[in-house]
């Protein structure tokens, strides 16, 4: 089984890049994990929000493989405490055969076809975060889940 974080647009700020890469590497000690970047759309000034979401949606769908289990990071998704998320991840590790793909959409969210392609939605908070920051929050929580499942010293209850 492989874990993939699919994001729209590259991470820009250096301090986020450094921290994200650190947690990605730490997480790889436990699981097969990678982060794939879908390039940002260019020349979007003449596109409506809906058109932009549709175009991003087409690129997201092209990045998915048959058999992927798709989980959207979405403000309307299920919320977990860290231990609950770790338990959810553990269940997925026993039931997903190919890739578990977490997707962070563009600035306007997801096109309807992406919601249709997803099996689940999870929310990392009721608060709103930048798309740059949420990447770091997610990879930190995935790493935390791995340390919880492996009785590591990182997480404290």
Residues covered by each model-derived region:
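Short glycine-rich anion-binding loops that position phosphate/pyrophosphate groups of nucleotides
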Residues: 11, 75-78, 106-109
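Conserved strand-to-helix beginnings and helix N-cap segments that scaffold or border functional pockets
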Residues: 17-20, 82-86, 115, 135
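S-adenosyl-L-methionine/SAH cofactor-binding core of RNA-modifying enzymes
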Residues: 32, 39-98
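Structured adenosyl-cofactor binding patch, chiefly the S-adenosyl-L-methionine
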Residues: 112-156
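Loop/turn-to-beta-strand initiation segments
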Residues: 2, 98-102
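N-terminal beta1-alpha1 ligand-phosphate binding loop
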Residues: 1-27
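General small-molecule cofactor/ligand-binding pocket signal
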Residues: 6, 34-36
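Proline/glycine-rich low-complexity loops and linkers
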Residues: 105-106, 117
């Amino acid at each position: 089984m492989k874990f993939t974080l699919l994001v729209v647009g590259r991470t820009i700020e250096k301090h986020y890049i450094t921290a994200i890469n650190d947690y990605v590497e730490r997480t790889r000690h436990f699981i097969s994990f990678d982060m794939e970047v879908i390039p940002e759309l260019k020349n979007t000034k003449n596109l409506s929000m809906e058109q932009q979401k549709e175009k991003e949606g087409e690129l997201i769908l092209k990045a998915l493989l048959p058999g992927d289990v798709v989980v959207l990071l979405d403000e309307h998704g299920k919320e977990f405490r860290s231990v609950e998320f770790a338990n959810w991840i553990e269940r997925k590790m026993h039931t997903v055969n190919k890739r578990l793909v977490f997707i962070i959409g563009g600035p306007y969210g997801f096109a309807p076809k992406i919601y249709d392609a997803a099996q689940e939605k999870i929310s990392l908070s009721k608060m709103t975060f930048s798309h740059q920051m949420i990447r770091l929050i997610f990879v930190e929580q995935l790493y935390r889940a791995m340390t919880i499942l492996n009785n590591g010293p990182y997480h404290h209850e």
